[in-house]
Structures are given as C-alpha cells and as structure tokens.
C-alpha cells in the first residue's frame, strides 16, 4: 500500500505580496523552505485561513531572510496581502515508512516570525 503523507508545513504565514502578472508559483523565503523541507519547484497546497480558499501551485525561493510569501499568477486571485495561510507539501511512501514518518512543521506569528519547528502535529484535545 502507498500512502500520501504530510511532508512539510508552514503554519500561519502571512502573505506579503500578491502579483497577478508574475509567472505563477508562490515565492517563499528560503529559510522557510529549509525549515519545512520544501524544495524549489515542489508542488504545494495553500490553505487560506483568512478567506477559506484552497489552491495548489509550486514553490520558488525568495531571498533568504526576507520573510516573503508572494502568491503569484492566477493564484493571486485566492490570496491578498495580509492574509494568513498554511502552506503544505506531501510525499508518497510505503505503509511501513509512513508509520515511522515525521513531517517538518514550522510555526509562525506576527510578520512571519518563525517561532518554532516541530517533527509532529500536536494531538488535539477536547
């Protein structure tokens, strides 16, 4: 059996740019890509916490340390500057690998300040 698992997640980053006329993609600070283990040109899903829209694109690197999250091309219709989004990538693996897998998660606050990283999603409690 093959499973699709969360590979990396940028939790609650703020969109800093939305450029309808740029050639597609989402530009992400290279430090953020590294923290989540997301590669340039990798497929990503973006879930807009602010407006509820969900869309797919691919990651490109923005300048390291810039804190840039730039939603580009047609996807710019799905996010505005200031929106809070979650960016995720996924990986496929065997059932055996999946049972040992730990994702790369980075948590953000304020103006894209990375507060911490983790290798698991916390258990939700009642």
Swiss-Prot record:
Biological process, per Gene Ontology: alanine biosynthetic process; pantothenate biosynthetic process
Residues annotated to bind substrate: 57, 73-75
Keyword hit for Cytoplasm: yes
Coiled coil: none
Predominant cellular place of this UniProt entry's protein: cytoplasm
InterPro entries (alphabetical): Asp_de-COase-like_dom_sf, Asp_decarbox
NCBIfam families assigned: panD
Protein name, as recorded: Aspartate 1-decarboxylase
Organism: Citrobacter koseri (strain ATCC BAA-895 / CDC 4225-83 / SGSC4696)
Gene: panD
């Amino acid at each position: 059996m093959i499973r699709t698992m969360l590979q990396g997640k940028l939790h609650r980053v703020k969109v800093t740019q939305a450029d309808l006329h740029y050639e597609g993609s989402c530009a992400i600070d290279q430090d953020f890509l590294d923290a989540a283990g997301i590669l340039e040109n990798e497929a990503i899903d973006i879930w807009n916490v602010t407006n509820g829209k969900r869309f797919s694109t691919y990651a490109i690197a923005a300048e390291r340390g810039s804190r840039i999250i730039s939603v580009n091309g047609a996807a710019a219709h799905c996010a505005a500057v200031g929106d809070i989004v979650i960016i995720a990538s996924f990986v496929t693996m065997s059932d055996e690998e999946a049972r040992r897998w730990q994702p790369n998660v980075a948590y953000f606050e304020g103006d894209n300040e990375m507060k911490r990283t983790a290798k698991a999603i916390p258990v939700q409690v009642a």
